Amino acid sequence: MEDHGFEELSTRTHDLNVRRLTKGNINFLLSTGQETYSVEDSGLLRILLVGKSGCGKSATGNSILRRPAFESRLRGQSVTRTSQAEMGTWEGRSFLVVDTPPIFESKIQNQDMDKDIGNCYLMCAPGPHVLLLVTQLGRYTVEDAMAVRMVKQIFGVGVMRYMIVLFTHKEDLADESLEEFVTHTGNLDLHRLVQECGRRYCAFNNKASGEEQQGQLAELMALVRRLEQEHEGSFHSNDLFVYTQVFLRGGYSEHQEPYKFYLTKVRQEVEKQKRELEEQEGSWMAKMLCRVTSCLDWHIAVSVLLIVLGLTLLITLINMYIGRWK
């Protein structure tokens, strides 16, 4: 017989913990229930919003939650200053949406950024089921591409297996379908991103309400369900998420020494993942260079063959011409 009471208590406890952490208190995991609490048991879905600053992550989070939970303004600058998590439900299932501060900018990692990244890990531990890469329709820029690279650096290169591209400003499609837009885009960086994400994408009009809002959320959740089935219910994890869980079980506050060690671990793991990303990119470049070289060798061989055939034909014609005059 299923213990629905424990499941409900676990969900409420997690909700309380999330609200405590949102207020900036790291000492939010009490020994009561936390050692036995399992996110998997409660069926809680963890959704992490990623993307460059000002891309509309907070507004997208509000659309998913169907309420103004995150501060959002109509401007191209980030409003979110620290990680924030909010609970919602869809068709009877609880989910957690984590909004992120500007940690995906191409800048030098400092102590404040270590803290922002560490808190983000704390929010979505033991790992997100899905990462939503938020970008504006028709505005995928170099900054967006750099933000994607930072996502890989912060969460590891394997994170793309759990990513869905979410385009904002769906209303700008007009009579064109999203499939047509993505298929015929001339933006090579966007094309590469969509392929890397397994062609998982959808679009939101964050001004929508009522049935339109419900419809686009249903489309997103259908994508999420397929992604979960593909991974058999697993979520993205790495060494830092494992270490984060160990830290959480201690129930330490941000003013205690273990929290400083935790931030040191955050920096070390992000640096390690950065090196792994660079190695992967180097390997990819080497393979591309090899392919180009192979293509060049093939073209050279064909060119030489054509030259030889041409010279042979020319010599034959000359001999025939000389033979006629003898």
Curated annotation (Swiss-Prot):
Positions in the Lumenal compartment: 319-326
GO BP: myeloid dendritic cell differentiation; negative regulation of apoptotic process; negative regulation of lipid catabolic process; negative regulation of nitric oxide biosynthetic process; negative regulation of T cell activation; negative regulation of type II interferon production; positive regulation of calcium ion transport into cytosol; positive regulation of CD4-positive, CD25-positive, alpha-beta regulatory T cell differentiation
Residues annotated as binding GTP: 51-59, 72, 169-171, 206
MF GO annotations: GTP binding
Residue ranges of domain AIG1-type G in the record: 42-245
A Gene Ontology cellular-component term: mitochondrion
Gene3D superfamilies per record: P-loop containing nucleotide triphosphate hydrolases
TM region positions: 298-318
Keyword Ligase: no
Keyword Secreted appears in the UniProt entry: no
Tissue: Primarily expressed in spleen, heart, lung and intestine and, at lower levels, in kidney, stomach and muscle. Expressed in thymus and lymph nodes (at protein level). In the spleen, expressed in periarteriolar lymphatic sheets. Isoform 2: Expressed at higher levels in T lymphocytes compared to isoform 1.
Quaternary state and interactors: Interacts with BAD, BAK1, BAX, BCL2, BCL2L1/Bcl-xL and BCL2L11/BimEL. The interaction with BAX is increased, when cells initiate apoptosis upon IL2 withdrawal. Forms a complex with BCL2L1 or MCL1 and HSPA8/HSC70; the interaction between HSPA8 and BCL2L1 or MCL1 is impaired in the absence of GIMAP5. May interact (via N-terminus) with microtubules.
Involvement in disease: Diabetes-prone biobreeding (DP-BB) rats have a frameshift mutation in Gimap5, which results in a truncated protein in which the C-terminal 215 amino acids, including the membrane anchor, are replaced by 19 other amino acids. These animals exhibit life-long T-cell lymphopenia, including lack of regulatory T cells, and spontaneously develop insulin-dependent diabetes resembling human type 1 diabetes.
Purpose: Required for mitochondrial integrity and T-cell survival. May contribute to T-cell quiescence.
Family membership: Belongs to the TRAFAC class TrmE-Era-EngA-EngB-Septin-like GTPase superfamily. AIG1/Toc34/Toc159-like paraseptin GTPase family. IAN subfamily.
PANTHER family named in the record: GTPASE IMAP FAMILY MEMBER 5 (PTHR10903:SF69), GTPASE, IMAP FAMILY MEMBER-RELATED (PTHR10903)
Protein's UniProt name: GTPase IMAP family member 5
